[in-house]
A protein has these predicted regions:
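Charged catalytic carboxylate motif
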Residues: 29-33, 83, 90, 189, ...
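Conserved CoA-thioester-binding segment of acyl-CoA-metabolizing enzymes
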Residues: 1-53, 75, 89
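Glycine- (often His-adjacent) and acidic-residue-rich active-site loop
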Residues: 3, 54-90, 106, 136, ...
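Short alpha-helical scaffolding segments that buttress acidic/His motifs in well-ordered protein cores
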Residues: 159-163, 208-211
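C-terminal long alpha-helix characteristic of the crotonase
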Residues: 121-126, 177-222
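Terminal peptide-recognition signature
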Residues: 15, 19, 33-34, 52, ...
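Acidic, divalent-metal-coordinating active-site segment for phosphoryl/phosphodiester hydrolysis
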Residues: 164-170
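CoA-thioester-processing core
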Residues: 87-93, 101, 107-161, 174, ...
Length: 222
């Protein structure tokens, strides 16, 4: 069974994390497969837009695989953390625009993965959060930086310090997700947005992505 699946139609590729029995939690194998998948997509000029989601209806991704983490050595833990950071960076920097279709829990590394996407559409059943402090660690896959950029420093501190989960509607209110839709129509709505983006100039969209990402901390003369 492939841990990450892809399906491409009309220039739109849907990438699914395929561990529904583990709430799509990411062990080292899943993380490495995601990196490989997005590196390959970055080279594919036939793909215009990428949708990232999780298999099943319960979870986009519950984040790092805690059971896996409990069984590995300290050196392996460091390597795993670096792999997780590389996952989110690879997703963020892929040339195509990305849409996270959040179909349930997006916690810890799962929330960080969603934040690495350009646009986030959440099912009304989704729950998001950075609960790492509840097990004695800080968010380690770029969550502190990306969350602050998306929702602002005060709200980011609240979410990280408390470790609480928030519902999809609250996530939309604070700007963490762009849209909230019924679970049954999540994939359809993500596809509609992907089609709208794909209908535009590929070069124009990709150059805009680079400009926006690089311009977050730049002045207008850069």
């Amino acid at each position: 069974m492939s841990l990450v699946t892809t399906s491409t139609s009309n220039g739109i590729c849907t990438v699914k994390i395929n561990r529904p029995d583990k709430l799509n939690a990411m062990n080292s194998d899943v993380a490495k497969e995601l990196i490989k998948t997005f590196e390959n997509l970055d080279k594919d000029d036939n793909v215009k837009v990428i949708i990232l989601t999780g298999e099943g209806e319960k979870a986009f991704s519950a984040g790092a695989d805690i059971e896996y983490m409990s069984k590995i050595s300290p050196d392996e833990s460091v390597a795993y953390a670096k792999t997780g950071q590389l996952v989110t960076a690879t997703v963020e920097l892929v040339k195509q625009p990305t849409i996270a279709a959040i179909n349930g829990f997006a916690l810890g590394g799962g929330c960080e993965l969603a934040m690495s996407c350009d646009i986030r559409i959440a099912a009304d059943t989704a729950r998001l959060g950075q609960p790492e402090v509840t097990i004695g660690i800080p968010p380690g896959w770029g969550g502190t930086q990306r969350l602050m950029r998306i929702v602002g420093i005060a709200k980011a501190k609240e979410l990280v310090y408390t470790g609480k989960m928030i519902k999809a509607d609250e996530a939309k209110e604070i700007g963490l997700v762009n849209q909230v839709v019924p679970l049954a129509s999540l994939q359809e709505e993500a596809l509609k947005m992907a089609q709208q983006i794909a209908a535009n100039s590929v070069m124009g969209v990709q150059m805009s992505k680079v400009a926006i990402n690089k311009g977050r901390n730049a002045d207008l003369d850069t």
